[in-house]
Amino acid sequence: MKLLSLHVQDFRNLAAVALAPSPRATVLLGENGQGKTNLLEAIYFLTTLKPLRAVRLAELVRFGADQGAVAGDFEGPGGVRRVAVQVAAGGRTATLDGKALGSGARLDDYFEGLASVCFSPDDLLLVKAGPDGRRRFLDRAAFNRWPAVLGEAREYVRALRARNAALRAGPAEVEASFREPLVRAGARLLVRRRELVAELAPRLQAAFAEISGPEAPEAHLAYRAAGGVDVAHPEAEVAARLAHALEARLERDREKGFTSAGPHMDDLVLALGGKGARLYGSQGQQRALVLALKIAEIENLRAALGRPPLLLLDDVSSELDPAKNRFLLGYLAALPAQAFLTSTDRRLIEPAAGPDTAFFEVRSGVVSPLVS
């Protein structure tokens, strides 16, 4: 699916933007703080209904405005569709071809064909940072793979909050009543994540070997569940094992007022040659591993959907060494995907630019076309 046109109104620092992107590569150039990332976030928000950066929704609205809006025309096998989302302090409202979700349009229909993968400098810290970032990566990748994950994750968060409240204030029978919904929703997420990791692992190995060469250690990817929950089973068995872990930790959880086992406590383990990359990998190896992980996600979606996702790359070239940047740009040039890239330096992108690459300047929230 291709983004034919993008309209942004009062989103972050973008007052009014009308963009006709290239079907292949659209490059946004400008100094830091001018709005390049905000434009990528507008596209990401349109295709996922979630902010790219964790904030309150009200912070997405331009200062002084009552609400922000993003709309796009997407061309796919079924023709052209218009998706739009308005955001204000009270929440967001999404529409598909003018019909609001829930009253004429379904969430599944909205997300059909809208998979997007974002790659930012923060992602390069994925290996060495804490598990929160790796869980966010897993959930975003799982959502792209199975859009129903969005609702499943929300169900789990609601159940988790309810059980935590019961642990802190409720009697035993109240906690027990909230445990079953948590187990059901948690097992569903655990199985989704397990299946995703199984799909990504061989693609990660192949991409890392291609990036780093034949002498590099073999890359591995594994899912580590908290509380000793073994997720290598059918969903019903995973649910039983999660329930057992929660029962075994009940007194400890009561003391802390917090659920200590479940998807919200798990981690994604990246290793090189059998050793944890977080502790034993060099910075260069860690960055190559993250690059390989992103390529694995793209290739996995390409295989599942029959087409590559929409790509959003936020100033990544400036954070990679020349060899890895050449590899990334070469990969993008060969991929039949629509990509949006930001940079402060045109020279980092230009070697891979094709005749259909479109360049734009972003300055103080204003987006203007540049002559090639």
UniProtKB/Swiss-Prot annotation:
Keywords assigned by UniProt, alphabetized: ATP-binding, Cytoplasm, DNA damage, DNA repair, DNA replication, DNA-binding, Nucleotide-binding, SOS response
An MF annotation (GO) of this entry: ATP binding
Residues the entry annotates as binding ATP: 30-37
Chief place where the protein resides: cytoplasm
Example of a GO biological process term: double-strand break repair
Annotated GO CC locations: cytoplasm
Pfam families, alphabetized: SMC_N
Superkingdom of origin: Bacteria
Protein's cellular compartments: Cytoplasm
Keyword Transmembrane helix part of the UniProt annotation: no
InterPro entries the UniProt entry points to: DNA-binding_RecF, DNA-binding_RecF_CS, P-loop_NTPase, RecF/RecN/SMC_N, RecF_2
Keyword DNA-binding among UniProt keywords: yes
Family: Belongs to the RecF family.
HAMAP family: RecF
Database matches in PANTHER family: DNA REPLICATION AND REPAIR PROTEIN RECF
Function: The RecF protein is involved in DNA metabolism; it is required for DNA replication and normal SOS inducibility. RecF binds preferentially to single-stranded, linear DNA. It also seems to bind ATP.
Name recorded for this polypeptide: DNA replication and repair protein RecF
